[in-house]
Regions:
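Conserved active-site-adjacent core of cysteine acyl-enzyme catalytic domains
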Residues: 1-36
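Histidine (H) residue identity feature
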Residues: 4-5, 44, 106, 117, ...
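Alpha-helix initiation/capping motif
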Residues: 9-18, 34, 66-73, 124-125, ...
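Polar/charged alpha-helical tracts
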Residues: 17-24, 70, 74, 107, ...
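Cysteine protease-like catalytic core of ubiquitin/ubiquitin-like
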Residues: 27-110
Length: 143
């Protein structure tokens, strides 16, 4: 699918507790959010994406754990039907979660027709070191 000239809105970054306060999220639209609340110091970046069918996908480079699902359910509107990735793609000692988010958005933009898990299989490896190299290479190329 060619999306070179397609506009997909992306809102400002928000904290997890501000997601529910967002006005209507368009189809498609990206929201980068931090898993900390607005008065916290910030903890980890993730992406909320509303796909063309209106379903929501959450990409988290460290994987959505049961603890994170509980946190997200607390802050996401009850009407959201959400698909999460539970697979970890980023090393635990890495601080590049924001870079992973932007890399995911870039890849998703050119593959809007792919479901979350399909896309993740094509862009990431089970080898976390290779994923780190891929994300860093993406930035070194000037994206």
């Amino acid at each position: 699918m060619q999306n070179h000239h397609r506009y997909v809105p992306m809102r400002q970054t928000v904290s997890v507790d501000e997601i529910a306060k967002l006005k209507k999220i368009k189809k498609p639209e990206f929201v980068v959010f931090n898993l900390d609340t607005q008065f916290g110091r910030g903890s980890h970046w993730a992406v909320l994406y509303r796909n063309l069918e209106g379903r929501f996908e959450i990409f988290d480079s460290l994987g959505v754990t049961p603890q994170k699902k509980k946190l997200l359910k607390k802050w996401l509107p009850k009407t959201f039907s959400v698909i999460y990735n539970t697979t970890k793609f980023q090393k635990s000692d890495s601080t590049r979660c924001g870079m992973y988010c932007l890399y995911f958005i870039h890849e998703k933009f050119f593959n809007l027709d792919l479901e979350l898990h399909e896309l993740l299989k094509t862009i990431f490896s089970k080898n976390l070191d290779k994923n780190e190299e891929k994300v860093m290479s993406f930035y070194q190329r000037g994206h």
